[in-house]
A protein has these predicted regions:
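N-proximal, solvent-exposed amphipathic alpha-helical segments enriched in charged/polar residues
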Residues: 1-43
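Generic surface-pattern signal
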Residues: 16, 20, 72, 111-112
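Hydrophobic beta-strand residues in large extracellular and virion-surface proteins
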Residues: 31, 48, 79-82
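Generic "edge-of-domain/loop-turn" microfeature
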Residues: 38, 57, 86-88
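A short interface-forming secondary-structure element
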Residues: 41-68
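A short amphipathic beta-strand at an alpha->beta junction
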Residues: 68-101
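Extended, charge-rich low-complexity interaction segments
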Residues: 104-114
C-alpha cells in the first residue's frame, strides 16, 4: 500500500504535468489524501481533500473535471473541496488545539496572496 503522502505528491506531479494552469492554482491550496473507513464493509476509501482560500474558490472549482479525472486515475474515490478560510476563522473550531500542525498549514494557505 502506498502512503498518503506519496499519493498526494504523485497527484500534484500529474496535475502540474498534464494541467499546468490547475497546478499553479493548486499551489495556493493545501492538498491532502483523506481516509474514510466503513466498519460494516471493513473497507477503506481514500478521498482527495483540497483546502482552498476563499479568494480563489471559483478558480479551484473551474478545474474540477481535470482534478477529478486525475484523482480517479490514481484510485481515489472523490474530490472534496474545503474552505480553509472558514476553518481557520471558525471561533468554535477545536482544530488549533487538536491538530496544531494542520491548523498552521491552513493558516498559511489563507494568508497567501495571489
Amino acid at each position: 500500500m502506498l502512503s498518503r503522502e506519496y499519493l498526494t505528491q504523485e497527484f500534484t506531479d500529474l496535475i502540474q504535468k498534464l494541467y499546468p494552469e490547475a497546478g499553479i492554482i493548486l499551489s495556493y491550496c493545501y492538498v491532502k489524501i483523506l481516509e474514510c473507513y466503513i466498519e460494516r464493509s471493513k473497507k477503506k476509501f481514500y478521498y482527495l481533500g483540497i483546502y482552498y482560500p476563499d479568494n480563489i474558490q471559483f478558480k479551484v472549482k473551474e478545474y474540477h473535471n481535470s482534478i477529478k479525472e486525475i484523482a480517479e486515475s490514481i484510485g481515489l474515490v472523490e474530490v472534496v473541496y474545503i474552505s480553509a478560510t472558514k476553518i481557520v476563522r471558525d471561533p468554535v473550531s477545536r482544530l488549533k488545539k487538536d491538530n496544531p500542525r494542520l491548523w498552521l498549514e491552513l493558516y498559511w494557505v489563507v494568508t497567501q496572496r495571489i
